[in-house]
Amino acid sequence: DENENLYGPNENKAKAKDLTAGASYLTKEAGCTKLQAGCTMYQAYN
C-alpha cells in the first residue's frame, strides 16, 4: 500500500518521540516532588 510506505516511518518516528517525551516527563515529575516551584519554572522554559 502506497500510503503505508509514506506514513509508516513517520508514525514510527512519532512513537519514538512520544517515548522520549514520556521518559523526559517522568524524569521531570520525579524532580517535581522535591522542588515544585522550581519544576514549574523549569517546565515553562523547556
Swiss-Prot record:
Its main location: secreted. GO terms for molecular function: toxin activity. Keywords: Cytolysis, Hemolysis, Ion transport, Membrane, Nematocyst, Secreted, Target cell membrane, Target membrane, Toxin, Transmembrane, Transport. The keyword Membrane applies. GO terms for cellular component: extracellular region; membrane; nematocyst; other organism cell membrane. GO terms for biological process: killing of cells of another organism; monoatomic ion transport. It comes from the Eukaryota. The keyword Membrane applies. It is found in: Secreted; Nematocyst; Target cell membrane. This toxin is a potent hemolysin devoid of enzymatic activity. Its hemolytic activity is inhibited by sphingomyelin but not by cholesterol. In erythrocyte membranes, it causes numerous cell membrane ruptures. It also exerces cytotoxicity to different cell lines. It exerces a positive inotropic effect. Also causes hemorrhage and necrosis by dilation of the blood vessels in the skin, and vascular leakage of fluids and rupture of alveolar walls of the lungs. Is a potent ichtyotoxin. May act as a pore-forming toxin. This is Toxin Up-1. It comes from Urticina piscivora (Fish-eating sea anemone). The lineage of its organism: Eukaryota, Metazoa, Cnidaria, Anthozoa, Hexacorallia.
